[in-house]
Swiss-Prot record:
Residues 125-397 form the Peptidase S8 domain. This is Subtilisin-like protease CPC735_066880. Residues 1-19 form the signal peptide. It holds the Pfam family Peptidase_S8. PANTHER family: CEREVISIN-RELATED, PEPTIDASE S8. It comes from Coccidioides posadasii (strain C735). One of its GO terms (cellular component) is extracellular region. InterPro entries: PCSK9_ProteinaseK-like (IPR034193), Peptidase_S8/S53_dom (IPR000209), Peptidase_S8/S53_dom_sf (IPR036852), Peptidase_S8_Ser-AS (IPR023828), Peptidase_S8_subtilisin-like (IPR050131), Peptidase_S8_subtilisin-rel (IPR015500), S8pro/Inhibitor_I9 (IPR010259), S8pro/Inhibitor_I9_sf (IPR037045). Residues 377-397 are annotated as: Disordered. Keywords: Glycoprotein, Hydrolase, Protease, Secreted, Serine protease, Signal, Virulence, Zymogen. Gene3D superfamilies: Peptidase S8 propeptide/proteinase inhibitor I9, Peptidase S8/S53 domain. Secreted subtilisin-like serine protease with keratinolytic activity that contributes to pathogenicity.
């Protein structure tokens, strides 16, 4: 796989003022190793392209023989109403020479594209069905089959049963900052993970799941343990080149904490989308953390009839509402259970964030605004100062 580090190194090595550049790509997972699309400048005539192509073939052949290489070189040319160039598989030395030619406009790594269809999950949990429906009462979840592929979701919670069959082997254990028990002794974390990325219960059915345990079996944890979990998650995403393709679900909260809010803000700034529960006290969420952090996506809960749940916090810091009453999802040991809370609403948004990153190639900083754009103004009795926006994945029925 061609790494972005190599691509940037090659570009840095080209010092000529008129040298072409290798364009960066948003998802290096799809890059075909050593395969490139070379685009010529607009003013390059067909005859100049032919001369350049001949030179490339000869240069590649002589150098490749000398280096005992196996790459095929130039494969095909294209000319689409004056948009000219070629496709080939080249080693680094040949690519350097191509980039230095002033006839070349840019080079782009060749990548895989796939059919883009939608899937329909019949008899889906009501919360999922509501995400793809224009009105309450539906039973089908319609979604784009990219479904969070290539995105990591960090479940910062009570831990996750990574062996639950609904996770299909996509879940791994990350870190435990609260105790010595590397299991989900509460069930809350496994439930939220099922909602954001389970195969049956989840929004982003192809996302990678990482369990970050910051709460104990009673569902409690210190601010410092939570901050350590946030810090570890950002560092893990950075080490795995996932910043910009990472989501954090924080179905937790407490009274206002500047330190916790600042930790959440730094995670957003680093390149992680944060979905945060608004809280369950029927109070103004501006007094809660991390719900009141300015750039997280704060989530209130609704019931099956699009009414704000009686327990859901409210207020101007809420960005969006999502289903949060009687939500069925995964539980430790392989089973399922019903839970209610803004903790159940937030993972719908974490999953939707990952989903939109994969389908629309959004940056984390764009995700919450995009979710609000796609939402319907459907929430009844949203609470004083609250939005009435209810999450939708944009497919609609």
């Amino acid at each position: 796989m061609v790494s972005m580090k190599f691509l940037s190194t090659v570009f840095a090595a080209i010092t000529a003022a008129n040298a072409a550049e290798i364009l960066s790509v948003p998802n290096t997972q799809d890059v075909i190793p050593d395969s490139y699309i070379v685009v010529m400048k607009d003013e390059v005539a067909t005859s100049d392209l032919e001369a350049h192509v001949t030179w490339v073939r000869n240069h590649h052949h002589s150098g490749h023989v000398r280096r005992n290489g196996t790459l095929t070189g130039l494969k095909t040319t294209f000319d689409i109403s004056g948009f000219r160039g070629y496709l080939g598989a080249f080693d680094h030395d040949t690519l350097d020479e191509i980039l230095a030619d002033d006839k070349v406009k840019f080079v782009e790594p060749n990548r895989i594209m796939r059919i883009q269809g939608t899937q329909t999950q019949r008899g889906a949990p009501w919360g999922l069905a509501r995400l793809s429906s224009s009105r309450p009462g539906g039973s089908d979840y319609v979604y784009d089959d990219r479904a969070g592929e290539g995105v990591i979701i960090y479940g910062v919670d009570t831990g996750i049963d990574v062996n639950h069959p609904d996770f299909e082997g996509r879940a791994t254990w990350g870190i435990n900052t609260i105790d010595q028990d590397n299991t989900d002794g509460n069930g809350h974390g496994t439930h939220t993970a099922g909602t954001f990325a389970g195969a049956r219960f989840g929004v982003a059915k192809k996302a990678t799941i990482v369990g970050v345990k910051v709460l104990d079996a009673q569902g409690s944890g210190s601010n410092s343990a939570i901050m350590e979990g946030i810090s570890w998650s950002v560092d893990h995403a950075r080490k795995n080149n996932a910043l910009g393709r990472a989501v954090m679900n924080l179905s937790l909260g407490g009274s206002f904490s500047q330190a916790v809010n600042d930790a959440a803000e730094r995670a957003v700034r680093a390149g992680v989308f944060l979905a945060v529960a608004a809280g369950n006290d029927n109070q103004d969420a501006s007094n809660y953390s991390p719900a009141s952090a300015p750039n997280v996506c704060t989530v209130g809960a609704t019931d099956r009839m699009d009414v704000r749940a009686t327990f859901s916090n409210f207020g101007s810091v809420l960005d969006i509402f999502a289903p949060g009453v009687d939500v069925e999802s995964t539980m430790p040991g392989g089973g399922t259970q019903m839970m209610s809370g803004t903790s159940m609403a937030a993972p719908h948004i974490a999953g939707l964030g990952a989903y939109l990153m994969s389908t629309e190639n959004l940056q984390p900083s764009q995700v919450c605004d995009r979710i609000k754009q796609l939402a319907s103004n459907s929430v009844r009795n949203p609470g004083n100062g609250s939005t009435s926006k209810l999450a939708n994945n944009g497919i609609g029925q």
